[in-house]
């Protein structure tokens, strides 16, 4: 065993190398005990640790007890050593993280890109979603954790593997779904559009039929509330209406995807599989449906023109939208509220989405911003005032 001790501010950082066993556990204990009690805590870098026995585990347990409420973390743990921590239960009582596997995407085919990162094919079985540097690691870890939860809860989604580092960026490895999105299928085979929209409605209903336990998933209402400060070009009073509107929205525990557009649903052997699970959460299903309404209608192209987001004529997008709601609700959208009172939230939630999406950043341009401001002032604010009476 070899160890190196350095200090990051008042935090003791211990780098471990080799094996820790009964023959050197006392030396290990003496080194840890020599760290000043006034330190902010202890960070153990196990990148070079090859093995640890029960004697070494007990030394770690004693060190953690000495730290009390202060920081005590073990990082960069190999799979072999992590197995020891898992089997013994230490991973449940200590803050322990695995070492990040290092890869390269040099020579790999780039098969997609989105707002948060790019997707590369690693091999015939796996892909890597490689995030842009601006995306925080905590957000990446959350998306992976949510994808795993979704899979366990019965939501059809791609199997996620590990968080890795590739060419200086962080990524997540997923199984490769050898299929096309519903959007691609519609564009390539419009004669079967109704069949594809039926799959679309079926998978949406399935997700919304799954209920989470309280606290099991983030609240989509909270996710939306956190986005309100990013809205620009509105007065403080107008911004307060966005908060007041969310206060009115019913809170339920139905599972939501957060962005159920036809480009986020793959079809493999006649079954749907969801991708991009970063906003997997709970709330009224009308949140998901209102985002579909927003992206296809309110943020869509003028009729007769080409919709560049969906890569098809706007007339086809309109057909998909109305057919989708008819299959989801079992009746045309115009009649949905009669049999499904919760459908009354569809347009108000779509107006809200207009504000939080079109008034954020400069992606949409002045014409869309003007439309969103008009919707806020002539539709959403009067709606909130009417509910308060």
Give the location of each predicted region.
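ATP-binding pocket architecture of kinase catalytic cores
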Residues: 109-110, 115-215, 250
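Active-site Asp-x-Gly
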Residues: 268-318
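Amphipathic alpha-helical interaction surfaces in cytosolic regulatory modules
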Residues: 20-94
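Active-site acidic catalytic loop and adjacent metal/ATP-binding pocket
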Residues: 109, 118-122, 242-287
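Helix-rich C-terminal or lid/interface subdomains of diverse kinases
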Residues: 307-389
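Short beta-strand/loop segment at the start of cytosolic alpha/beta domains
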Residues: 1-15
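Conserved N-terminal boundary motif of the eukaryotic protein kinase catalytic domain
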Residues: 102-110
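An alpha-helical support segment within catalytic cores of ATP-dependent transferases
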Residues: 209-258, 262, 268, 388
